[in-house]
């Protein structure tokens, strides 16, 4: 077999390394991260769902003053039946809640870490030297996301495992495993539709129907659960994502939005100031042009030159990343797929040969990856991006693309010549430098969010008032120890004051930020006139990016 995975199954001996990896990862998390690490609101939201299910046995939230529930804009929504639920999928947090009941805090990261270990198990079946796989995986944002309660790595695991089963002829089982990933990430619906289209074009009817048969039960069960829980088969996220924060748009503005999405999600990596965009295009265009060579060994000199440019450019981007100290904000402008994962160079440099490879599995995987990359930017909402790290919307296919990239480099002879080896080493080094920065940022930010949470929890008052939409998700334990009142509008402020007076609450914790204000100075003055600060505020910072003021306010006699 010239490409893809080898036929032998995964033995117990081969599982030893992934098991050791999982244990070491959990020990790393225990040593350097809080028990419930919070990077941004998205994964903090999932921790809130987890806590709510653990304490109340429900994915729906109760609040003594529903008008002041910390909705965080669209992060939490009220259903037609009046119940409040998260915008995000509840299924991973619920599974994690059950694990935490059994294993305590160690259960928070168990699913992501074990998922990455399983990805390792499958990827180590790839032909060739194993260290190449390990280095390439280390140079991608997989380890970073395995240290957070987030669905990216479990979803990537289902895709990678399904691909391995698909290659081995276990098509029905592959369909079932793939569809299990639908419970994690909605992007897999797109990936599944693309795969169906490819199989139809190849007239692989038998394979397609077997895959669909395996996928039918998990997919139907998900649609049924979403309908029963949320009144919509797409769930809350799937049914509202496209309209969140999106203004009315003309055809021209929508066209510009799509073009921006392609740049944002495939290329952008703003660590070189105003030169970032020109440098990114200068790095990618030669590699993409070389990828149109009619064979792996054709245009060899041009491929090597393009590879050198790509490797040197991504090394420059990676080195410049370390000068950035705003660990959160820089993550909003550094997630272009091909710059942020330089080990995908082999995919770009050998694009056409991979698409036309004689091995049907390799060609199908390459076509699936390319079509997914080209379709997803049309579907993403640029008004609902927020802070992230790396190309998170492509995490699901990155392991498969890494396999294709290494395979392409082998076939193109990059591992035999000095120049080719240097290109591969430089791309791997660039990726590892980026991921070391990511883990450093993760340790810093999660420590800061934990400090902010502990500061609020340490104050004995049981009510928290804030106009910051992201406070509950950045401090996910607080809503279950105290009542949080959101005052992001004049109406909410009035409702909060009425609630405080109705419940005879004479003092509360006020959390503000000089950088993000939803209420005006006049509205804040109205609140502080009735409940003046009882002392100087405590100033806290998260990730050198966000400043917070925490103070106690007490009603005047």
Q: Locations of the language-model features?
A:
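Signature aromatic-anchored transmembrane alpha helix within multi-pass, membrane-resident enzymes
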Residues: 1, 14-22, 176, 213-216, ...
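Perimembrane helix-loop-helix junctions
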Residues: 5, 167, 190-224, 281-298
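Membrane-lumen/periplasm interface segments of multi-pass, membrane-embedded glycan/lipid transferases
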Residues: 68-80, 230-354
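Specific aromatic-rich, kink-prone transmembrane helix
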Residues: 121-124, 138, 154-178, 196-198, ...
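Short acidic/glycine- and proline-prone juxtamembrane loop motifs at membrane-interface regions
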Residues: 144-155
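Hydrophobic/aromatic-rich transmembrane helices and adjacent perimembrane loops
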Residues: 184, 329-347, 364, 385-412
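Membrane-embedded, lumen/periplasm-facing catalytic core of multi-pass transferases
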Residues: 388, 422-478, 485
């Amino acid at each position: 077999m010239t490409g893809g995975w080898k036929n032998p199954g995964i033995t117990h001996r081969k599982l030893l390394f992934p098991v050791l990896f999982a244990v070491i990862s959990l020990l790393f998390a225990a040593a350097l991260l809080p028990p419930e690490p919070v990077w941004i609101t998205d994964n903090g939201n999932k921790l809130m769902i987890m806590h709510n299910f653990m304490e109340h046995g429900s994915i729906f939230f109760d609040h003594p003053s529903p008008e002041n529930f910390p909705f965080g804009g669209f992060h939490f929504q009220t259903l037609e039946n009046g119940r409040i639920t998260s915008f995000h999928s509840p299924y991973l947090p619920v599974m994690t809640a059950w694990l935490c009941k059994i294993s305590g805090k160690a259960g928070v990261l168990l699913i992501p870490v074990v998922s990455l270990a399983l990805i390792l198990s499958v990827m180590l079946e790839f032909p060739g030297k194993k260290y190449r796989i390990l280095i390439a995986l280390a140079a991608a944002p997989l380890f970073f996301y395995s240290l957070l309660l987030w669905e990216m790595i479990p979803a990537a695991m289902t895709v990678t495992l399904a691909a391995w089963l698909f290659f081995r002829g276990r098509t029905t089982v592959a369909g079932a495993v793939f569809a299990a990933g639908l419970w994690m990430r909605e992007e897999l619906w797109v990936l599944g539709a693309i795969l169906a289209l490819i199989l139809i074009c190849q007239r692989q009817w038998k394979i397609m129907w077997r895959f669909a048969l395996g996928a039918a039960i998990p997919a139907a069960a998900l649609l049924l659960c979403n309908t029963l829980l949320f009144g919509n088969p797409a769930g809350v996220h799937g049914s509202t994502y496209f309209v969140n924060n999106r203004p009315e748009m003309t055809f021209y503005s929508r066209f510009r939005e799509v073009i921006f999405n392609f740049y944002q999600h495939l290329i952008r990596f703003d660590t070189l100031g105003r030169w970032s965009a020109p440098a990114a295009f200068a790095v990618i265009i030669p590699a993409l042009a070389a990828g149109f060579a009619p064979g792996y060994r054709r245009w060899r000199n041009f491929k090597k030159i393009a590879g050198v440019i790509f490797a040197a450019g991504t090394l420059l981007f990676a080195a410049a990343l370390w000068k950035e100290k705003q660990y959160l904000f820089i993550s909003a402008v550094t997630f272009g797929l091909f710059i942020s994962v330089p080990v995908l160079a082999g995919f770009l440099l050998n694009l056409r040969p991979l698409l036309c490879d004689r091995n049907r599995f390799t060609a199908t995987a390459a076509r699936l990856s390319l079509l997914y990359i080209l379709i997803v930017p049309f579907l993403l909402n640029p008004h609902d991006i927020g802070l992230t790290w790396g190309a998170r919307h492509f995490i699901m296919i990155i392991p498969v693309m890494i396999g294709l990239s290494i395979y392409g480099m082998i076939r193109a002879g990059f591992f035999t010549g000095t120049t080719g080896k240097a290109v591969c080493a430089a791309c791997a080094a660039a990726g590892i430098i980026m991921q070391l920065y990511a883990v450093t940022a993760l340790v810093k930010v999660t420590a800061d969010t934990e400090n902010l949470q502990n500061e609020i929890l340490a104050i004995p008052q049981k009510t928290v008032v804030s106009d910051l939409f992201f406070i509950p998700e950045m401090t996910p334990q607080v809503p279950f120890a105290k009542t949080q009142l959101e005052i992001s509008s004049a109406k909410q402020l009035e409702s909060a004051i009425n609630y405080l007076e109705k419940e005879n609450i004479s003092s509360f914790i006020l959390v503000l930020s000089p950088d993000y204000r939803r209420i005006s100075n006049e509205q804040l003055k109205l609140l502080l006139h009735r409940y003046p600060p009882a002392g100087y505020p405590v100033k806290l910072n998260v990730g050198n990016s966000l400043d917070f003021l925490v103070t106690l306010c007490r009603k005047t006699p």
